[in-house]
């Protein structure tokens, strides 16, 4: 995916074979909370995409080396629930299919995406299709995860 160079908000589907492979998994709650709180403070406690205030999520963003099947952790973003759920719209679909979330959530997210990016429903649907096409291809591979400068050892040095 082009990391949304022409859009402020774009979908980032993590390949199924990488689910739960993230920094949060290897850190203690205290260590993760330190990172999360720092990310929120640097963003002035606002969503870094749409500017909303209120509850935030610390989103890990990744870069993918498709040739060598390596996912690289590149950093973090403070995101509101709507922007974060668009990033992980596949998870939203799972929650809806299980009956945990109402279908209306998807409609609300589409409206949020269109508003933030100033695009129509057709562009939203095209973006969703492209994101899932990339996800399907990437999910066929077994990926290595590279936490880079955010690995547990280097993170502990900066936290304590």
Where are these regions (language model features)?
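DNA major-groove recognition helix of helix-turn-helix/homeodomain DNA-binding modules
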Residues: 81-83
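Hydrophobic alpha-helical segments, principally membrane-spanning helices and signal/leader peptides
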Residues: 13, 44-45
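Histidine-centered nuclease catalytic patch
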Residues: 36, 40, 46-78, 87-98
């Amino acid at each position: 995916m082009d990391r949304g160079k022409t859009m402020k908000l774009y979908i980032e589907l993590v390949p199924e074979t990488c689910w739960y492979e993230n920094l949060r998994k290897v850190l203690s709650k205290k260590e993760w909370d330190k990172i999360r709180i720092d990310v929120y403070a640097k963003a002035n406690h606002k969503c870094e995409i749409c500017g909303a205030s209120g509850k935030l999520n610390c989103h890990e963003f990744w870069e993918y080396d498709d040739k060598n099947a390596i996912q690289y952790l590149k950093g973090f973003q403070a995101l509101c629930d709507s922007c974060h759920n668009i990033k992980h719209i596949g998870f939203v679909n799972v929650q809806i299919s299980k009956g945990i979330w109402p279908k209306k959530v998807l409609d609300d997210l589409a409206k949020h995406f269109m508003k933030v990016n100033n695009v129509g429903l057709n562009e939203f649907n095209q973006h969703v299709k492209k994101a899932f096409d990339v996800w399907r291809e990437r999910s066929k591979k077994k990926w290595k995860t590279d936490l880079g400068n955010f690995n547990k050892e280097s993170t502990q040095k900066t936290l304590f």
